[in-house]
């Protein structure tokens, strides 16, 4: 059964052009905690969508449930796999970096998904997670408009505290949290600043490290 992401993949992809400064702001925030990816490091974006973030951030692999989105992602030279986050088709300890951007709100089973992230990460591997904070003004706006948004209609937005609890349970230790998007999206004409912490910005990025006591 095709989802809205399959039926409207091009529309979804065009959002990043129509909101280029919002996209730029999110990229800057992610880069602040992601850092440079070395050629020998294996990296993957879970919920890669149409590959916008992966392409610019030099993420080699991408995974998504939408076959139509992955067709666009492949054009951006990302190695693609169709699967769900709760059942990753990769060997344990196979990636140095995992990126997830606005994916947490679509997870059917967050506990299982983050356990899978832990499994595929190498010891000291890094998860970088970008999210819309449910408790922010942006998060409240998205929730209010959910019924009319074909992409977020069935999303469950989460707070930073909720995500932190999921990470803790999966033995993923938080290292850094930053935030951006302090104004309504329609008012953003230049890249927004990035601040440490959360509670002000609508878009929050958390970095977490796989704990060393991996068995």
Question: What feature does the model see in each segment?
Answer:
Residues 155-177:
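Short alpha-helix
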Residues 99:
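A conserved beta-strand element that flanks and buttresses the S-adenosyl-L-methionine
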Residues 102-105:
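Short catalytic micro-motifs in class I SAM-dependent methyltransferases
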Residues 111-123:
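A short glycine-rich, Lys/Arg-flanked "PGG" loop and its adjoining helix->strand segment in the class I
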Residues 190-215:
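Core SAM-dependent methyltransferase catalytic element
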Residues 1-38, 52-53, 69, 126-154, 181, ...:
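Conserved class I S-adenosyl-L-methionine
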Residues 44-87:
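Class I SAM-dependent methyltransferase SAM/SAH-binding core
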